[in-house]
UniProtKB/Swiss-Prot annotation:
Pfam families named among the record's database cross-references: A24_N_bact, Peptidase_A24
Cell location: Cell inner membrane
Signal peptide residues on this chain, from the entry's feature table: none
Alphabetized UniProt keyword annotations: Cell inner membrane, Cell membrane, Hydrolase, Membrane, Metal-binding, Methyltransferase, Multifunctional enzyme, Protease, S-adenosyl-L-methionine, Transferase, Transmembrane, Transmembrane helix, Zinc
Catalytic function, reaction form: Typically cleaves a -Gly-|-Phe- bond to release an N-terminal, basic peptide of 5-8 residues from type IV prepilin, and then N-methylates the new N-terminal amino group, the methyl donor being S-adenosyl-L-methionine
Keyword S-adenosyl-L-methionine annotated: yes
GO biological process: methylation; signal peptide processing
Knockout consequences: Deletion mutants are unable to secrete several extracellular degradative enzymes including the cytolysin/hemolysin tthat remains in the periplasmic space. It results also in significant decreases in host cell cytotoxicity, adherence and virulence in a mouse mode.
GO molecular function: aspartic-type endopeptidase activity; metal ion binding; methyltransferase activity
Superkingdom, natural source: Bacteria
Protein's UniProt name: Prepilin leader peptidase/N-methyltransferase
InterPro entries per record: Peptidase_A24A_bac, Prepilin_IV_endopep_pep, Prepilin_pept_A24_N, Prepilin_peptidase/N-MTase
Job of this protein: Plays an essential role in type IV pili and type II pseudopili formation by proteolytically removing the leader sequence from substrate proteins and subsequently monomethylating the alpha-amino group of the newly exposed N-terminal phenylalanine.
Length: 289
């Protein structure tokens, strides 16, 4: 373990390798967790409303079973075809059996996980909190892509993330105090909850989902309430830019719904990495102005 402390490049390399390997599992989480949730909802509906004769699901699906397979020909993926990034490149982005194209997003998620984990290790160095922040980063990646795909932010991700942030503050592993962590979680939830109900009162429409409240609560628990204004501002700016671009490219009306969770996740991660620098720059800009 001393080698990791004295050779930072080794620590960064191992963190990147860990991110690469876990990134492969994140692809499974991103694809399967919404389907698992749907199966659970169907089962609950069938049990709660027997008068509607809802057929309960017969399929069994977990994050580990059954084995991953090609969505087109359903051939199980071989072990040598499951190496992050490299297998996709070796197969030229196609299934080895039916030659159906495999989405480039799979290696992208793996490479992104490796890159961001390496950045976290580089930024925070060899410390217990770094391991936690790597986990924090990986959960944000999974939540981002699930929200992009389904407009859902699963409680299975946001709630454990919130309680982990508070637990780290309680154990004094996190630099955030317990008081700031708890208040950050409460303020994060109530902030978007208030915006949601105000928007609904004024327009009669729902502007965001409850998953967004819980994700901001998790970010507040990890970073403290002081960073919430920055996260909200950054996520709003990024969301506005990408929303306008998407509206222009897809030529859809302003009524089109956009997931807000990815922008919260991006803003939260940026605040984690460079929040102090951004805050200093902003204050210096105000003083200089």
């Amino acid at each position: 373990m001393d080698a990791l402390q004295y050779y930072p490049w080794l620590y960064i390399g191992l963190a990147s390798l860990f991110g690469l390997l876990v990134g492969s599992f994140l692809n499974v989480v991103i694809y399967r967790l919404p389907k698992i949730m749907e199966l659970e909802w169907r089962q609950e509906c069938a049990e709660s409303f027997p008068e509607y004769n809802i057929t309960p699901p017969t399929e069994t699906l977990t994050l580990s079973t059954p084995r991953s397979s090609c969505p087109s020909c359903h051939t199980p993926i071989r072990v040598r075809d499951n190496i992050p990034v490299f297998s996709w490149l070796a197969l030229r982005g196609k299934c080895h059996h039916c030659q159906t194209k495999i989405s480039a997003r799979y290696p992208f998620v793996e490479a992104l996980s490796a890159f961001l984990c390496g950045l976290v290790a580089w930024k925070f160095g060899y410390a217990p909190i770094t391991v936690a922040l790597i986990g924090f980063t990986l959960v944000l990646i999974a939540a981002t892509f699930i929200d992009l795909d389904t407009m859902l932010l699963p409680d299975q991700l946001t709630l454990p993330l919130t309680w982990t942030g508070i637990a780290l503050a309680l154990l004094e592993i996190s630099p955030v105090s317990l008081q700031d962590s708890v208040f950050g979680a409460m303020a994060g939830y109530l902030c978007l909850w208030s915006v949601y109900h105000l928007f609904r009162l004024l327009t009669g429409k729902e502007g965001m989902g409850y998953g967004d409240f819980k994700l901001l609560a998790a970010l507040g628990a990890w970073l403290g309430w002081q960073y919430l204004p920055m996260i909200i501002l950054l996520s709003s700016v990024v969301g506005l830019i990408f929303g306008l671009i998407q509206l222009r490219l897809q030529k859809q009306g302003i009524e089109m719904a956009f997931p807000f969770g990815p922008y919260l996740a991006i803003a939260g991660w940026v605040a984690l990495m460079w929040g102090d620098s951004l805050m200093s720059w902003y204050l210096n800009y105000l003083i200089g102005a």
